Amino acid sequence: SGDFNYYDSIEKLSKGLIEYQIQNENDTLNGMYFCWGNTWHNWGNNQANGLIEAYEVTADSSILSSVQLWANSFVPFVIENNFPWEISVSSTNHFEMVSVPQIAYGLGSIYKGLKSLSVVNENDSYKQLSEDVFKWFKGNNIAQMVMYDNETGRCFDGIDGPSKINRNSGAESTIECLLAIQSRKG
């Protein structure tokens, strides 16, 4: 008949994402969502933002708790470790980080998740954490370079090393940065 229970689908997808999250307070990577296999990567890690959108539809507190765990535990780890590109976990729970490249799309994803959480939760600490992530665009990054140009509106694609900027400014990078700027004002 064409009826579709999207609430059920949202719940199932949300539970699936949460199952791919480390939930162990004794684990350094507590709160991390795996993106692929045994790996988290900076590129498009939109689980938190997607889960917040799911929470707004379902009001399922387990979804909100999952994103709060990510924000309280994993995001500070990412910030302290200068926004790594990738984290891979071995079968013995040892992990390795790859520091670069760092891309605007990756930082924008973390920022959006935190910003959405701060709005839903009305919590200033999450808003401040989102601002700590946004500072990457303003030069608080491993290259110590401002990534966004106020005069032209462009954003550089990313960072390829401690002092090496990818000065391309493709649509994806610029849009991610501009969306982050726009949501800061909201």
Language model regions located:
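Glycan-recognition and catalytic cores of secretory/periplasmic carbohydrate-active enzymes
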Residues: 1-186
